[in-house]
């Protein structure tokens, strides 16, 4: 009996096919495919024991041990999980690390139960190679970088573009000391896969890309080197907005939106405690650059703002966010501009930069 195979393809991701990952949970946590659900053939301990048997006694002994470990009630439970997933997603595909014995075993068991589903040839490894190649290829196509002072709403601008790629969204981090997301950051592989999906979801997946001006490190994630080099040589647009506008935007980003996320994830009491801890810790991390006296002044203002926030006055945060912009972020940005002079295709307010980026994308369409 030759069990069906499908070739690895980005279309499987773009079309949001349900993928059943039969690797162990520890492998899944180290990097998964977008849209995949982890329904393992073996759990972490079983995989570990089979791996030892393979190393010490060879493949036949490892296979025999695997059959012994995953039998009876354990086998029935895992079969049930696969059957339920396929009932909910009849077009689901199966994969393991290389599309070999584990996914073939799952296929075989399902076939014996009257269910035929293909596995992906080459498995996770082949699909990851396609995603990474797609990300690298984007650096060879036209790319535009959106720059500007902190609070210029660059990320919302990116998300208003059909060819935009939100790197901060992929990293689940806003790229600054205050940018940590309440949910855990993705691992490096999942960050790269999120970039790949972002590119696939563009109106023209083979067209130009517009990104925000970022350092290569966004939180714990690193922008892939080839893509980063494409960003470095790409033309730039600079958003210029007045201080009061940027202050309102930064309050929305660092306070209003962050509170919504914490409240939704953890509830009022714990969410408030965790948000306060994040913001106060982030401020302390800037001690070296702010200096002790300035840090202590901002800490006092931040503490007062927290009290006012509890009374319903979120605008009070502008008392410490304002100096943070004018005394830290703005001078830092201007220093970087002086150190690395840049030529901008366009400099203007948010609306004009959005219009320019849309026009640029249309002119560079594939």
Predicted regions and their residues:
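Positively charged, proline/Ser/Thr-rich regional signature most characteristic
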Residues: 13-86
């Amino acid at each position: 009996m030759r069990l069906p195979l499908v070739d690895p393809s980005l279309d499987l991701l773009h079309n949001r096919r349900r993928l059943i990952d039969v690797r162990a949970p520890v492998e899944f946590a180290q990097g998964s495919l977008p849209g995949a659900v982890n329904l393992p053939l073996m759990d972490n301990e079983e995989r570990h024991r089979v791996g030892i048997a393979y190393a010490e006694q060879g493949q036949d002994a490892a296979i025999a041990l695997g059959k012994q470990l995953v039998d009876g009630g354990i086998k029935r439970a895992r079969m049930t999980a696969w059957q339920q997933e396929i009932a909910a997603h009849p077009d689901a595909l199966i994969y393991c690390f290389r599309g070999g014995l584990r996914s073939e075993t799952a296929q075989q068991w399902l076939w014996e139960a009257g269910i035929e589903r293909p596995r992906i040839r080459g498995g996770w490894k082949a699909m990851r190679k396609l995603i990474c190649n797609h990300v690298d290829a984007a650096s060879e196509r036209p790319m535009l970088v959106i720059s500007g002072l902190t609070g210029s709403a660059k990320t919302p601008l990116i998300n208003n573009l059909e060819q935009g790629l939100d790197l901060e969204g992929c990293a689940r981090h806003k790229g600054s000391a205050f940018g940590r997301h309440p949910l855990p950051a993705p691992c490096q592989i999942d960050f790269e896969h999120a970039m790949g999906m972002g590119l696939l979801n563009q109106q023209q997946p083979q067209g130009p890309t517009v990104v925000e001006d970022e350092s290569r490190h966004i939180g714990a994630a690193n922008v892939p080197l080839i893509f980063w080099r494409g960003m470095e040589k790409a033309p730039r647009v600079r958003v210029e907005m007045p201080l009061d506008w940027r202050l309102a935007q930064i309050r929305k980003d660092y306070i209003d939106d962050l509170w919504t996320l914490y409240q939704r994830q953890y509830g009022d009491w714990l969410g408030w405690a965790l948000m306060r801890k994040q913001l106060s810790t982030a401020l302390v991390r800037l001690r070296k650059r702010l200096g002790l006296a300035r840090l202590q002044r901002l800490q006092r203002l931040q503490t007062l703002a927290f009290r006012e926030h509890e009374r319903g006055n979120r605008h009070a945060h502008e008392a410490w966010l304002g100096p943070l912009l004018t005394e830290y972020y703005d001078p830092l940005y201007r220093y970087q501009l002086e150190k690395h002079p840049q030529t901008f295709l366009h400099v203007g307010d948010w609306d004009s930069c959005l219009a320019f980026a849309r026009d640029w994308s249309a002119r560079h369409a594939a």
